[in-house]
Amino acid sequence: MVLYALFYVFLVLFIFFDSFKQESNKLELSGKEERKLGNGEDRLTSDSYLLFFLSYYSLLLLSSDRRSL
Protein backbone atom coordinates (compact mmCIF):
# COMPACT_ATOMS: atom_id res chain seq x y z
CA MET A 1 0.00 0.00 0.00
CA VAL A 2 2.92 2.32 0.69
CA LEU A 3 4.21 1.77 -2.82
CA TYR A 4 0.80 2.69 -4.25
CA ALA A 5 0.76 5.92 -2.27
CA LEU A 6 4.28 6.82 -3.41
CA PHE A 7 3.32 6.02 -6.98
CA TYR A 8 0.33 8.37 -6.77
CA VAL A 9 2.45 11.16 -5.27
CA PHE A 10 4.98 10.88 -8.10
CA LEU A 11 2.17 10.68 -10.65
CA VAL A 12 0.60 13.86 -9.28
CA LEU A 13 3.94 15.67 -9.36
CA PHE A 14 4.54 14.55 -12.95
CA ILE A 15 1.09 15.72 -14.05
CA PHE A 16 1.58 19.07 -12.31
CA PHE A 17 4.93 19.80 -13.95
CA ASP A 18 3.70 18.57 -17.33
CA SER A 19 0.64 20.84 -17.21
CA PHE A 20 2.83 23.73 -16.08
CA LYS A 21 5.17 23.13 -19.03
CA GLN A 22 2.27 22.94 -21.49
CA GLU A 23 0.74 26.14 -20.13
CA SER A 24 4.03 28.02 -20.39
CA ASN A 25 4.45 26.80 -23.98
CA LYS A 26 0.96 28.07 -24.83
CA LEU A 27 1.78 31.45 -23.37
CA GLU A 28 5.00 31.70 -25.37
CA LEU A 29 3.28 30.73 -28.61
CA SER A 30 0.33 33.06 -28.19
CA GLY A 31 2.35 36.03 -26.98
CA LYS A 32 -0.17 36.75 -24.22
CA GLU A 33 0.91 37.11 -20.61
CA GLU A 34 -2.30 35.71 -19.10
CA ARG A 35 -4.76 33.16 -20.42
CA LYS A 36 -8.10 33.10 -18.71
CA LEU A 37 -10.96 30.65 -18.96
CA GLY A 38 -14.50 31.76 -19.62
CA ASN A 39 -15.25 32.02 -15.90
CA GLY A 40 -12.18 34.19 -15.27
CA GLU A 41 -10.21 31.59 -13.33
CA ASP A 42 -6.66 30.79 -14.35
CA ARG A 43 -6.45 27.24 -15.72
CA LEU A 44 -3.12 26.57 -14.05
CA THR A 45 -4.55 27.62 -10.70
CA SER A 46 -7.55 25.31 -11.03
CA ASP A 47 -5.25 22.42 -11.99
CA SER A 48 -3.08 23.18 -8.97
CA TYR A 49 -6.04 22.81 -6.62
CA LEU A 50 -6.94 19.47 -8.14
CA LEU A 51 -3.38 18.22 -7.86
CA PHE A 52 -3.16 19.45 -4.27
CA PHE A 53 -6.23 17.43 -3.29
CA LEU A 54 -4.96 14.34 -5.12
CA SER A 55 -1.60 14.51 -3.36
CA TYR A 56 -3.35 15.13 -0.03
CA TYR A 57 -5.52 12.05 -0.60
CA SER A 58 -2.41 10.00 -1.43
CA LEU A 59 -0.76 11.12 1.79
CA LEU A 60 -3.88 10.17 3.73
CA LEU A 61 -3.70 6.70 2.22
CA LEU A 62 -0.06 6.49 3.20
CA SER A 63 -0.71 7.58 6.78
CA SER A 64 -3.69 5.24 7.18
CA ASP A 65 -1.54 2.38 5.91
CA ARG A 66 1.08 3.14 8.55
CA ARG A 67 -1.54 3.17 11.32
CA SER A 68 -2.72 -0.29 10.35
CA LEU A 69 0.77 -1.77 10.79
UniProtKB/Swiss-Prot annotation:
GO cellular component, one term: chloroplast
Main location: plastid
Annotated localization: Plastid, Chloroplast
InterPro entries reported for this sequence: Ycf70-like (IPR035337)
Keywords: Chloroplast, Plastid
Family: Belongs to the ycf70 family.
Identification of the protein by name: Uncharacterized protein ycf70
Organism: Zea mays (Maize)
Taxonomic lineage: Eukaryota, Viridiplantae, Streptophyta, Embryophyta, Tracheophyta
Name of the gene: ycf70
